[in-house]
Design a protein with these regions (language model features):
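Flexible loop/hinge segments at secondary-structure junctions
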Residues: 1-207
Length: 207
C-alpha cells in the first residue's frame, strides 16, 4: 500500500529529477529505480489525479512516460517490476491478471479500488463520478430523452466496459431532474475531489 503523501512526494512538480528511486519516497521501499507512467496533459484523468494528489490540476513532474493510449501505460507497467502508473479502472480490470492494484491510505488505512469501495466513498481521493450534460434545447427531442432514459435505467451496462455503475437511487434522482427540466450543476464549474456518491446525491437533491 501507499499513502496519499507518498504519491504526492512521487508525483509533485518538485520531484522532477530529484525523486528517482523508490527508497527516496519511503526508506522502507527498495533502493531501485522509480519508473513512472501516466496519461498525457490533455487527459481528464491527468487533470483529476494532479488535482487530487498535488492540489492543482496539471501540476506534475514531467519526467515520466506519458501516453494518451492507456494500453501503452498498461504495457509499460506490466513489463517493468519497478514501475508504477495510473490510468482508468477499466484498463486495470482488463489486465488484472498482469497488474497489481495499489491500496491507497488517505489516513484511515489502506483501501483497494473496487466497486464497493468506490460506491461507499472509502477509495478516496482517487475515484470520481463522470457526468453527461444535455443541452436544454436538445432535452426536448424525443430521441435524446429516449437515450437519457435508456442510459439511466440500464446503468449496469457500464460494468461491461470496466466502469463502475452508479447506485440505482442516484440514477433515479438524475432521471427525475431530467424529467423536471432542472438545469445547472452542483459543482459551479470546479472539480470536487474526494466527494462520495452519497454526498453527491445530497447536493443534487438541493437543486
Amino acid at each position: 500500500s501507499m499513502t496519499v503523501a507518498e504519491l504526492r512526494k512521487m508525483w509533485e512538480p518538485a520531484a522532477q529529477g530529484r525523486i528517482t528511486t523508490w527508497n527516496q519516497v519511503n526508506p522502507k521501499f527498495p533502493k531501485e529505480k522509480l519508473m513512472l507512467f501516466g496519461p498525457g496533459a490533455d487527459s481528464g484523468t491527468f487533470d483529476y489525479f494532479t488535482e487530487a494528489i498535488n492540489g492543482k490540476a496539471k501540476a506534475s513532474r514531467g519526467d515520466f512516460t506519458a501516453s494518451e493510449d492507456d494500453n501503452t501505460l498498461v504495457q509499460g507497467v506490466e513489463s517493468n517490476k519497478n514501475a508504477l502508473g495510473y490510468f482508468g479502472y477499466a484498463y486495470y480490470a482488463a489486465h488484472k491478471d498482469k497488474l497489481t492494484a495499489v491500496a491507497i491510505d488517505n489516513g484511515k488505512g489502506p483501501v483497494s479500488p473496487s466497486l464497493e469501495n468506490v460506491t461507499n466513498g472509502t477509495y478516496n481521493p482517487l475515484s470520481r463520478p463522470l457526468f453527461v450534460y444535455v443541452r436544454e434545447s436538445s432535452a426536448k427531442r424525443p430521441e435524446v430523452r429516449e437515450f437519457v432514459q435508456f442510459m439511466l435505467t440500464n446503468g449496469d451496462l457500464v460494468g461491461e466496459v470496466g466502469y463502475l455503475p452508479l447506485p440505482k437511487s442516484a440514477c433515479a434522482l438524475a432521471w427525475k431532474h431530467f424529467q423536471d427540466g432542472k438545469l445547472g450543476t452542483v459543482f459551479g464549474g470546479h472539480p470536487q475531489v474526494g466527494i462520495t456518491i452519497e454526498q453527491l446525491q445530497a447536493l443534487e437533491g438541493k437543486l
